[in-house]
From Swiss-Prot:
Biased composition (Basic and acidic residues): 47-66
Cysteines engaged in disulfide bonds, as pairs: C139-C203, C181-C231, C191-C233
Recorded GO CC terms: axon; dendrite; extracellular space; synaptic vesicle
UniProt GO BP: cell surface receptor protein tyrosine kinase signaling pathway; modulation of chemical synaptic transmission; negative regulation of neuron apoptotic process; nerve development; nerve growth factor signaling pathway; neuron projection morphogenesis
Highest taxon in the source lineage: Eukaryota
Species whose genome carries this gene: Pseudechis australis (Mulga snake)
Tissues of expression: Expressed by the venom gland.
Subunit structure as annotated in this protein's UniProt entry: Homodimer; non-covalently linked.
Keywords: Cleavage on pair of basic residues, Disulfide bond, Growth factor, Lipid-binding, Metalloenzyme inhibitor, Metalloprotease inhibitor, Protease inhibitor, Secreted, Signal, Toxin
Signal peptide boundaries: 1-18
Pfam family, one: NGF
Organismal lineage: Eukaryota, Metazoa, Chordata, Craniata, Vertebrata
Similarity field: Belongs to the NGF-beta family.
Protein name from the UniProt record: Venom nerve growth factor 2
Length: 242
């Protein structure tokens, strides 16, 4: 009986000694540990490489301040914005070069170099002054297309006018057709054709409001601004004749 017990104990001890050791109990310098270390290093290197490539493909988003500065320097306008009738005016024009001196009754339009050149030629043919009819204006006026950097809006505030507009990858300038007085006193007595014995007269400009593309912060917006549109004669009755 005792021999049987000894035999079972010895067999049990031999089985424990012959069982493979687990990786958790492997000494630090064993081949199993080296394989795990190499695998971890390779995986870490691969993760770093993947992360670097990901950063290159998807750079970190820029700061909001940088984005605002970039948008302010190069504002792109949607062409559909100009198709709305309430934004159209015959005195506002967007063109790549200075438009002709004549003003037609068309709405907001965009001219390329060829169209503007053709209209310049037509303007020279159609706008010759007529001197043989004996007709004279009470006040002498001058009309021209101009650009503006600032203007007064309908609320009386000074606003920044957008000069250059990026539209379909082309830069257009915003022009305004203004009419001003050439001289406040076309004749020594004031307005032409006014009886200076009874009236005191002088020429002055009048203004109206048109929709223009302006800057509000870093965004472009439409506003009513004031421009010169006519030259009229102002008369007052002399008090000596009352």
């Amino acid at each position: 009986m005792s021999m049987l017990c000894y035999t079972l104990i010895i067999a049990f001890l031999i089985g424990i000694w012959a069982a493979p050791q687990s990786e958790d109990n492997v000494p630090l310098g064993s081949p199993a540990t080296s394989d795990l270390s190499d695998t971890s290093c390779a995986q870490t290197h691969e993760d770093l490489k993947t992360s670097r490539n990901t950063d290159q493909r998807h750079p970190a988003p820029k700061k909001a301040d940088d984005q605002e500065l970039g948008s302010a320097a190069n504002i792109i306008v949607d062409p559909k914005l100009f198709q709305k009738r309430q934004f159209q005016s015959s005195r506002v024009l967007f063109s790549t070069q200075p438009p002709p001196l004549s003003r037609d009754e068309q709405s907001v339009e965009f001219l390329d170099n060829e169209d503007a050149l053709n209209r310049n030629i037509q303007a020279k043919r159609q706008n010759h002054p007529v001197h043989d009819l004996g007709e004279h204006s009470v006040c002498d006026s001058i009309s021209e297309w101009v650009t503006k950097t600032t203007a007064t809006d309908i609320k009386g505030n000074t606003v920044t006018v957008k000069v250059d507009v990026n539209l379909n990858n082309h830069v257009y300038k915003q022009y305004f057709f203004e009419t001003k007085c050439r001289n406040p006193n076309p004749v020594p007595s004031g307005c032409r054709g006014i009886d200076s014995r009874l009236w005191t007269s002088y020429c002055t400009k009048t203004q109206t409001f048109v929709r223009a593309l302006t800057m509000e912060g870093n965004q472009a917006s439409w506003r009513f601004i004031r421009i010169d549109t006519a030259c009229v004669c102002v008369i007052t009755k002399k008090t000596d004749n009352l």
